[in-house]
A protein has these predicted regions:
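OB-fold and OB-like single-stranded nucleic-acid-recognition modules
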Residues: 24-157
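N-terminal secretory signal peptides that target proteins for export/translocation
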Residues: 1-6
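Bacterial N-terminal signal peptides
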Residues: 9-20
């Protein structure tokens, strides 16, 4: 009888341990992460051209997710009010809205986007529509250049 109780106790312990492990598991998106060293978002923000074309791993809290296709994440910087966008090819990786507020590690290539005024208008109009916000074309003064991470893989902690 005592052997049966011990066996039952061990089985219950294993079930609980395995269940807890699956709940605590990281969510993986896209390719597995290969870099070990995290590059601070603030370093990229400070000198973005130094990082263009380079593979980096960033880490931070997800502050926004594309509501239409889950095709990008905005990752909070390690400095106040800063953020950096991680974009994926539409449909290749789909980030869930539940990623907001979680810590993400995202790996990819830093890219520079140079937009003409017309492209910048279309870009900002599209983002306003995604967020359900009004768009004033007068806010776009001319061509724009910005930087983002072309994400290849990510983990939500």
């Amino acid at each position: 009888m005592q052997m049966m109780s011990l066996r039952s106790l061990v089985i219950m312990f294993l079930v609980v341990a395995l269940s807890a492990g699956s709940v605590l598991a990281k969510q993986q998106f896209g390719r597995p992460l290969t870099l070990a060293v995290v590059t601070k978002v603030s370093e990229i923000e400070k000198n973005p051209r130094d990082f263009v074309g380079k593979k980096v791993l960033i880490r931070g809290t997800v502050v926004e997710v594309c509501a239409k296709r889950g095709c990008w994440l905005d990752i909070a910087s390690d400095t106040p009010y800063g953020k950096f966008q991680a974009k994926v090819v539409d449909g290749v990786i789909v980030f869930p809205m539940s990623a907001r507020g979680k810590v993400a590690r995202v790996e990819g290539i830093v890219e520079e986007l140079k937009l003409s005024r017309e492209e910048a208008l279309a870009y900002h109009r599209h983002h306003a529509e995604e967020k359900g916000l009004p768009f004033d074309p007068a806010t776009v003064k001319g061509p724009e250049t910005f930087y983002r991470l072309q994400a290849q893989g990510a983990e939500l902690e």
